[in-house]
Amino acid sequence: MKNIVVNNISTSYYITEDGKCYNSYTNKYLIGQINYKNGYLSYILTLPKGNKKRCYAHRLVANAFLQ
């Protein structure tokens, strides 16, 4: 499990190698949404200042593990 960084901001979310997203603040796994147009799994992440951002799971995994 690795920390998710969005727009160079560290978040309280972690991503696993198989695409599951974990919130360390609530100690729960997030329930993703599948986009009906392209079939990709996405999560809505709340950033530290309260802004929300939709992120695709495959991109989060790539950014976390392919560095």
Question: Where is each model-derived feature located?
Answer:
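Conserved recognition-core residues within compact binding domains
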Residues: M1-Q67
